């Protein structure tokens, strides 16, 4: 499974990348706003840190304008992945970006298996189902991941399932068990994956016993 971080915070991205955990980054207009920077500058900084795909989102809603914005974003760095919404214009833009620009495309705001099927047909590199937001409605977001996995396997679609709107470490575990290709999560969630009370307890016991030996290493 690939780990992407869902943030535009340069400090967090650099820290996780230095740990060797990052395969990519996802951003959106809300995260760019939170960063306080300009989209081109922030995206370039991220691309200089992370070698994997860095999703940068168009904000236009019509095909022609989406394509114009995609051209601008693509010039920032070779590893920019153009992010488009799951609309008819977004799907059309996805197809064009993939076939004519030969750039990665992340189709976002997916909430149904039918939408995911359309994105795969359009040649999307990634489909981003929002599991947390589905959970908020009282449904089970992971059921959607299961449905998409089965559909993509049925027809050997190469579109990668990028599990998004990840809120908990359990979301990560469930996505991995189902076979999602990628998860994108906030920095705090990725860091929380390492936590377990028995690990802490065991380490404390080992250190206490080691102190009693009076030894040093090196």
Curated annotation (Swiss-Prot):
Pfam families per UniProt: TAL_FSA
The cross-references to PROSITE patterns, in alphabetical order and at most eight, read: TRANSALDOLASE_1, TRANSALDOLASE_2
Per UniProt, which keywords does this protein have? Cytoplasm, Pentose shunt, Schiff base, Transferase
Q: Active-site residues?
A: 83 (schiff-base intermediate with substrate)
In the record, what terms sit under GO molecular function? aldehyde-lyase activity; transaldolase activity
Catalysed reactions, as listed in the record? D-sedoheptulose 7-phosphate + D-glyceraldehyde 3-phosphate = D-erythrose 4-phosphate + beta-D-fructose 6-phosphate
One of this protein's GO BP terms?
Answer: pentose-phosphate shunt
The places in or outside the cell where this protein is found are:
Cytoplasm
Give the EC number. 2.2.1.2
Give any Gene Ontology cellular component. cytoplasm
EC class name: transferase
Recorded metabolic or biological pathway in which this protein acts: Carbohydrate degradation; pentose phosphate pathway; D-glyceraldehyde 3-phosphate and beta-D-fructose 6-phosphate from D-ribose 5-phosphate and D-xylulose 5-phosphate (non-oxidative stage): step 2/3
Spell out the family assignment given in the record's similarity comment: Belongs to the transaldolase family. Type 3B subfamily.
Q: What does this protein do?
A: Transaldolase is important for the balance of metabolites in the pentose-phosphate pathway.
Q: Which PANTHER family match?
A: FRUCTOSE-6-PHOSPHATE ALDOLASE 1-RELATED (PTHR10683:SF40), TRANSALDOLASE (PTHR10683)
Q: State the protein's name.
A: Probable transaldolase
Look up and give the organism this protein is from: Mesorhizobium japonicum (strain LMG 29417 / CECT 9101 / MAFF 303099)
């Amino acid at each position: 499974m690939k780990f992407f971080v869902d943030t535009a915070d340069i400090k967090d991205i650099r820290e996780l990348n230095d740990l060797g955990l990052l395969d990519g980054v996802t951003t959106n207009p809300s995260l760019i706003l939170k960063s306080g920077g300009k989209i081109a500058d922030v995206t370039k900084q991220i691309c200089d840190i992370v070698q994997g795909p860095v999703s940068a989102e168009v904000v236009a809603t019509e095909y022609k304008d989406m394509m114009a914005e995609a051209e601008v974003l693509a010039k920032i760095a070779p590893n920019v992945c153009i992010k488009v919404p799951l609309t008819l214009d977004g799907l059309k833009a996805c197809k064009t970006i993939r076939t004519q620009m030969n750039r990665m495309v992340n189709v976002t705001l997916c909430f149904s298996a039918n939408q995911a099927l359309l994105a795969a047909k359009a040649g999307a590199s990634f489909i981003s189902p929002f599991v947390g937001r589905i959970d908020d409605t009282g449904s089970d977001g992971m059921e959607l991941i299961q449905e998409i996995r089965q559909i993509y396997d049925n027809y050997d679609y190469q579109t990668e399932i990028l599990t998004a709107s990840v809120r908990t470490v359990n979301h990560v575990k469930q996505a991995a068990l189902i076979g999602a290709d990628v998860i994108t999560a906030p920095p705090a969630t990725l860091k929380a994956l390492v936590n377990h009370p028995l690990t802490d307890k065991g380490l404390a016991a080992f250190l206490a016993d080691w102190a009693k030996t009076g030894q040093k290493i090196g």
